[in-house]
Amino acid sequence: MSTTEIEKVVKGASYSALLLNDCGLPITAANIAALFKTAKLNGHETTFKTFEDFLKTNPITNYIGAIGGSAPAAASSAPAKKEEPKKEEPKKEEPKEEETDMDMGDLFG
């Protein structure tokens, strides 16, 4: 078996494990083999058993979502603040002085 064939089997087993987990089925060598048979892929029972044994001690849910969680380098580390619409406060009306008709002459008596 060449390296590319081994890589295909490992990828297929990985995808099978993800699919079985997503469907809520146990990740066993028999279930992985059934998926390979359905997809008309060639694989070895030892590879399927290796995946089953590994995933018994290391649940696949530990690896889901753990990849690529970092932010781009250009992004700031602080979360962006949401701008809330400013509430306009009602303007207080200043008391108006009563307007009187005054002439300049009334000022001096």
Curated annotation (Swiss-Prot):
GO molecular function, one term: ribonucleoprotein complex binding
Positions of region (3 X 5 AA tandem repeats of K-K-E-E-P): 81-95
Sequence repeats: 81-85, 86-90, 91-95
Annotated Basic and acidic residues bias: 80-95
Alphabetized Pfam families for the sequence: Ribosomal_60s
Record's compositionally biased regions (Acidic residues): 96-109
Keyword Ribonucleoprotein belongs to the record: yes
Record note on modification: Not phosphorylated.
Entry's Gene Ontology BP terms: cytoplasmic translation; translational elongation
Family: Belongs to the eukaryotic ribosomal protein P1/P2 family.
Protein name stated in the entry: Large ribosomal subunit protein P1
Native species: Tetrahymena thermophila
